């Protein structure tokens, strides 16, 4: 069975009710649920939450609900903890082939990217797929502060041409895919063989503050404009 798991904890320190905050007429979690269904990649779309309000909203959009363990409802629970809790609960009830861990603040992510992840996972030879974006400039020429002065992080790259520097990538925190047929047991020490899909421009934006939220709205509005 192919599962999409969307984590949506009720508590949020910096933006109140962030996972169900109104975003162009819909709770923002709607966009992840809707894209999961429209992609036609999953047998089940499940929201992991501790909130009755979030559960009711997610149900109204067609998602199933998994009430997560109480010890996974604070700011210290990791994504792997949440996934492990879900997999251990369901593995005796249903056979899971793969799992997509899709974040709820994903209005920019495209269905095309979800399908690319699935295709890459289907090719095998890996346990996990992550979604990344390339840094605009190489971190080999990054600076650090030392004793109130600034200097190159790696002195040997100071005179290198930009075209001779390596490309570096960052985790976008949009979704993770796991081939559960190749993962007998989840644990923090497991070394996942991981491949990546590189995102196009304007497919993700980190939202940690209300200022970030307002920027996200502008990017989304611009994407809607480009589609006209």
Which positions does each model-derived feature cover?
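N-terminal glycine-rich phosphate-binding loop and ensuing alpha1 helix
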Residues: 1-48
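Short, structured coil segments at secondary-structure junctions
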Residues: 41, 61-62, 146
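Short active-site oxyanion
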Residues: 41-46, 127, 202-203
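Short, high-confidence coil segments that cap the C-terminus of an alpha-helix
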Residues: 42, 94-96, 123-126
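Short phosphate-binding loop-to-helix
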Residues: 46, 52-100, 108-112, 116
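Conserved core of the sugar-phosphate nucleotidyltransferase
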Residues: 107-199
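Hydrophobic helical membrane-anchoring modules
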Residues: 185, 197-198, 202-228
């Amino acid at each position: 069975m192919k599962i999409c798991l969307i984590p949506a904890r009720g508590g949020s320190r910096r933006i109140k009710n962030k996972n169900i905050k109104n975003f162009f007429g819909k709770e923002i979690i709607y966009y992840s649920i809707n894209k999961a269904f429209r992609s036609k990649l999953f047998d089940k779309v499940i929201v992991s939450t501790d909130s009755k309000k979030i559960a009711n909203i997610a149900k109204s959009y067609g998602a199933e609900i998994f009430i997560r363990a109480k010890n996974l409802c604070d700011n210290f629970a990791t994504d792997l903890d949440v996934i492990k809790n879900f997999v251990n609960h369901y593995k005796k009830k249903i056979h899971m082939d793969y799992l997509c861990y899709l974040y709820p603040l994903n209005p920019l992510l495209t269905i095309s990217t979800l399908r690319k992840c699935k295709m890459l996972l289907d090719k095998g030879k890996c346990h996990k797929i992550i979604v990344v974006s390339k840094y605009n400039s190489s971190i080999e020429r990054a600076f650090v502060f030392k004793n109130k002065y600034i200097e190159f992080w790696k002195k040997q790259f100071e005179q290198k041409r930009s075209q001779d520097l390596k490309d570096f990538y960052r985790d976008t925190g949009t979704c993770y895919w796991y081939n559960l047929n190749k993962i007998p047991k989840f644990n923090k020490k497991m070394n996942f063989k991981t491949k990546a899909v590189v995102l196009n421009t304007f497919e993700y934006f980190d939202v940690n503050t209300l200022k970030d939220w307002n920027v996200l709205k502008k990017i989304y509005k611009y994407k809607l404009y480009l589609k006209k």
